[in-house]
Design a protein with these regions (language model features):
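Conserved N-terminal beta1-alpha1 strand-loop-helix module at the mouth
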Residues: 1-198
């Protein structure tokens, strides 16, 4: 199971994620309680081993602006939330970066078609709410062997069952490993990765 831990903002949380076996880490570079500056993300990259993707997360920024900010942070992956188009994915790829395109289960089915993204992230209808949802509903999309991440309401207690229900290739977590909004609990980070990979 591929595991991405998102919304990291401290050296300790990055190390807890990668040392417990996370396959990717995410830095929020958009307005959020988890937002960090590009300079801070660059500082945290020192603690991310080679081969572990570090992803810059963006919500409403234009794809070209996201590329500039990600480059400033030293990142090679961009995660795009919000209303997007295939041209946004192309813009990021043309810059030599890889793309995670985030969509919600409340969105029109056409958005689940491939736009050439490297990974698809499927979230709850209200991203960032931390609320659980009907994970099994993803199966009707017929994603097959496509590489995609399940997100929304996941935590160490439910990630195993949720991933099985959705037949997920990977999982993504942020609020489900926090002691308070925007503050990662290192024990929960470790427990989540362990549970997802069990």
């Amino acid at each position: 199971m591929f595991v991405k831990v998102c919304g990291l903002s401290t050296r300790e949380s990055v190390r807890a994620a990668v040392e417990s076996g996370a396959d990717a880490v995410g830095f929020v570079l958009t307005k959020s309680p988890r937002e960090i500056s590009p300079d801070r993300a660059r500082d945290l990259l020192v603690h991310v081993p080679e081969g572990v993707p570090a992803v810059g997360v963006f919500r409403h920024e234009a794809a070209a602006d996201a590329v500039v900010t990600a480059r400033e942070a030293g990142l090679e992956w961009v995660q795009l939330h919000g209303s997007r188009s295939p041209e946004d994915v192309k813009t990021v790829h043309d810059a030599g970066m890889q793309v995670i395109r985030a969509v919600t289960m409340g969105a029109a089915p056409v958005e689940f078609e491939t736009w050439g993204e490297d990974l698809l992230l499927i979230d709850a209808a209200v991203p960032g709410s931390g609320e659980t949802w009907d994970y099994s509903s993803v199966r009707k999309l017929g994603l097959g062997a496509r590489h995609w991440l399940l997100a929304g309401g996941l935590n160490p207690s439910n990630v195993g069952a949720a991933a099985l229900e959705a037949e997920a290739w990977g999982v993504d977590v942020s609020s489900g490993v926090e002691s308070s909004r925007g503050v990662k609990d290192l024990d929960l980070v470790r427990a989540f990765v362990q549970a997802a990979k069990a």
